[in-house]
């Protein structure tokens, strides 16, 4: 009998470890952290900073009826035109009366939803979950956003931001999937955003930035035609904003403040916003003009033009080096 052949033991094939690319755990963590940060806001009351005029003593939102809804969309109120924001207050009052908790709850809920949309948009755009995590955490937890969430009247900020990013997501889906329905949704959501706050008109140039980042030819006929309805809506609501502010004398005459001073103050606001984003200090709900009319401007305000000049040179450098990711992030 021949000797049995020794059987070579089979090597165990190590199964590759599957990476869990599901963002659900990150999303839960980000939203949980944001909720914890804003828990104190549930106890906030109505402030005499516009909350009385816009909410508790606003005669057009106390009763939910057709006449009041028509009034919200057809008239200026308190020097502004944001009917969708006032309509959301009307709905809150029907649900919880004038209890501040219901208004605070809605603000926080909208902020959470927008934080989620930012996560989705950034991941959709860059396909890198770590960038989406950082961006959504910064938005959800940064001190500069506390005013918009914790102050009832600033509902217009959290509401317009929600529709703004929802519109961006829809437009980006239109670019990737080439389906017209996403374009229609982007336009509709943009309209909802400007009906919440006029600042949403910034979406129109943001779409051009998105086109550039996605490699589209900006002078292409189709690309130009796509932007016409967005810019038309933006111009219309820009005019409405000027008219609404003029109705209460909120727009100063040209000779009230020299154009050079206006430019310097704009640069100062730009510089301080960047600085407070990096190092949030001395935050306030109200930032008055630094000097009385006719007085000279302190040197620090003239120096605030330097960050704007530096930003221009930085953008030129980024474009020259074709660092499109950084250029897009900076401009966005």
Each language-model region and where it sits:
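Polytopic membrane enzymes that build or remodel cell-surface glycoconjugates and lipids
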Residues: 2-332
